[in-house]
Curated annotation (Swiss-Prot):
Annotated region described as Disordered, given as residue ranges: 458-480
Function: Capsid vertex-specific component that plays a role during viral DNA encapsidation, assuring correct genome cleavage and presumably stabilizing capsids that contain full-length viral genomes. Participates in the interaction between the capsid and the tegument through interaction with the large tegument protein/LTP.
Coiled-coil stretches noted in the UniProt entry, renumbered to this chain: none
Database matches in HAMAP family: HSV_CVC2
Pfam families named among the record's database cross-references: Herpes_UL25
Organism of origin: Psittacid herpesvirus 1 (isolate Amazon parrot/-/97-0001/1997)
Protein name as it appears in the record: Capsid vertex component 2
Length: 627
């Protein structure tokens, strides 16, 4: 408070017997001396004595201390803010080489696994071909399908094994898309950016998990997590089953077509179908290839129902939080009845009658043989899958029946989205250029030959690698001359090609995959389509709260190891319910492709070729400057 060597600060009379002198002392003390006494008496007082300090001095002292405390707090706050930034930078410096090392190790392990087999497989194939074994040739042709060889980090990786290839095909494609971009950036549309923004806003600490950079580009971890969640949307998490819902759906469609054909033959008095009908399937894979024909027959009967068509179940009779009934395998009576697919299957005998619906006494007069209780799906499952040795009894497993109906409805939506699609448009209009990501033949389907109504001889045109939207020169010349105008009407040809060249190989490699596992983009369309009215691109991400919750759970799976089964089921089954809601609404729309066009653009879909790739892959990467 006082400097060294300052003059006295105050003189005052003390009790009339002398003057006191206030001197400055280096020790910040006040020395008060009596000047009239021969031997001055010194009294030392500290500065904080109230009787020596005025009110102003105390206030000034407290203000100085307050300012000093504020300065110390500001310095501490600055250090506290800087510490997480420095720690995050250090963590990123540590995580980047670790992630690169993990990806490298996974790639090396995958290569080692694949390179161990090709020589043996190739020798076996050559032996079969030399012996004239047609099955070996067919196996080779299947391995050359478009989904077998992909380009990853500049190297060709043959996907030989089921459990290492097709099961992770979609996730590996995302990794490959980011790797193929090099130093550039890839964008996936505003829909993925909206999902990332919502996830960052609703979940603390997600920036570190996703590794989001300051430029706001879409995280590869987010895209992979979204693809995993979309693929699981139609899966049943409760119970163990020998058959998937996709397999049950294909068998139901097969039986429905067989029953309809039998009824038509009985009415016409013919012993065989017309020449335009395809040959009946003798194996399950042949039945998969004929699904577009089965769907066409089903759609004809749906149109005959006029206004009494509903693609929704009775939610009042279904569990509110879970897909499967608690401690049971059956719903309340009549829960599935409003759905048009259920009603048609029931009318054709695809779903057998049960004791809850009718008794033997009630149908004895009209059906003395009780044929209504016959279960054709159980017999068909044993015929298609004799090695499983257990029949598929849908009437005893209503959650699987519900999932099978959902699978049929998803196929119907897929057919409507792809109907009359034109993959021969100008390839420069495509947002997704497949040639940048796939190696080998990247070709679209061609028009069926004369007499090949159901695409038995559909194949690639044999041109070198190119984007699938490129039109073959011969077809382009025919169109310009006017002779090929009918080729523009593709009908279901692209769907036939997709089931033959994409879905069959994928099912062969993993026969437990559901419809959303084959077409994750179809699940995304259903989730966005659950909003009433025409969805807008700005609100495309707002209606996916269930998707956000499951993505958050997937990304935090290492932190949520203690989460109960009820929590996982609730979060997962919420997205299944939203998918069912969107599916029922989209199937009720007259022109679903036009209805969803604004949202599809938010998903990077501009052309029919983009739409087909998005339905199969779940995302469409394209090169951008700012992701």
């Amino acid at each position: 408070m006082f400097g060294r060597g300052l003059p006295p600060l105050k003189f005052g009379q003390i009790g009339g017997d002398g003057w006191s002198t206030v001197l400055a002392d280096p020790g910040n003390r006040l020395i008060v001396a009596n000047a009239h006494r021969s031997e001055p008496r010194l009294r030392v007082e500290t500065l904080i004595r109230e009787e020596l300090l005025t009110s102003r001095a105390r206030i000034e002292d407290l203000e100085r201390r307050n300012r000093a405390a504020h300065a110390a707090l500001d310095r501490l706050a600055g250090k506290a803010v800087a510490i997480p930034l420095r720690a995050a930078a250090e963590l990123k410096n540590v995580e980047r080489p670790l992630e690169a090392a993990v990806e490298l190790l996974e790639d090396m392990a995958e290569r080692a696994h694949h390179e161990h087999e090709p020589a043996v497989v190739e020798d076996e194939r050559c032996r079969k071909l030399s012996a004239g074994d047609q099955s070996g040739q067919d196996a080779g042709d299947d391995d050359d399908a478009g989904v077998i060889r992909i380009l990853k980090n500049g190297s060709v990786i043959p996907l030989w094994k089921p459990r290492t290839g097709a099961k992770d095909f979609h996730v590996n494609f995302v990794t490959m898309a980011f790797a193929a971009s090099g130093d550039g950036r890839v964008g996936f549309g505003s829909w993925y950016r909206a999902l990332q923004s919502q996830l960052l806003d609703s979940s603390r600490g997600m920036e570190r998990i996703l590794g989001v950079s300051q430029d706001g580009r879409v995280s590869s971890r987010l895209v992979r997590a979204v693809i995993r969640v979309l693929r699981s949307a139609a899966e049943i998490y409760v119970g163990h089953r020998n058959y998937s819902a996709f397999e049950a759906a294909v068998m139901c469609l097969f039986q429905y077509d067989a029953a309809k054909r039998e009824l038509a033959d009985a009415k016409d008095g013919r012993g065989s179908s017309s020449g335009n009908e395809p040959r009946p399937a003798s194996t399950f894979e042949e039945a998969i290839k004929l699904v577009p024909h089965y769907l066409r027959a089903l759609q004809e009967d749906v149109r005959r129902e006029w206004g009494a068509v509903s693609y929704a179940f009775d939610r009042t009779k279904l569990p509110q939080k879970f897909f499967s009934p608690v401690d049971a395998k059956k719903y309340s009576n009549g829960a599935l009845s409003p759905h048009i697919v259920y009603r048609l299957f029931k009318a054709r005998g695809v779903f057998a009658a049960t004791g809850r619906e009718v008794t033997k006494e009630e149908i004895a007069t009209v059906d003395p043989d009780f044929s209504r209780f016959d279960d054709p799906i159980a017999n068909l499952s044993l015929a298609f899958f004799p090695a499983r040795r257990s029949p598929l009894s849908l009437h005893e497993d209503e959650p699987l029946m519900r999932a099978a109906i959902d699978a049929v409805a998803l196929m119907m939506l897929l057919q409507r989205l792809m109907y009359n699609s034109d993959v021969y448009a100008n390839s420069m209009a495509n947002r997704f250029q497949a040639a940048a990501f796939f190696e080998g033949r990247v070709t679209g389907p061609v028009a069926p030959a004369s007499g090949d109504v159901y695409g038995d001889r559909l194949s690639g045109d044999g041109d070198p690698i190119r984007a699938p939207g490129s039109r073959p020169p011969a077809a382009a010349e025919a169109t310009l001359s006017g002779d090929g105008s009918r080729d523009v009407v593709s009908l279901d040809n692209n769907l036939v090609f997709l089931f033959d060249k994409y879905l069959c190989p994928m099912y062969r490699y993993d026969n437990r995959t559901e419809m959303t596992g084959f077409f994750p983009g179809l699940a995304a369309v259903c989730l966005v389509g659950k909003v009433r009215g025409v969805p807008s691109p700005s609100s495309a991400g707002d209606c996916c709260s269930s998707l956000i919750n499951l993505v958050d759970l997937d990304l935090r799976k290492t932190e949520n190891t203690g989460a109960g089964a009820a929590v996982v089921l609730t979060v997962h089954d919420a997205i299944t319910y939203d998918m069912e809601t969107g599916l029922s609404r989209l199937l009720s729309v007259f022109d679903v492709k036009k209805h969803m066009k604004p949202v599809l653009r938010a998903m990077n879909v501009e052309t029919d070729s983009d739409l087909i790739y998005f339905l199969c892959l779940g995302c469409l990467p394209h090169h951008v400057t700012i992701a």
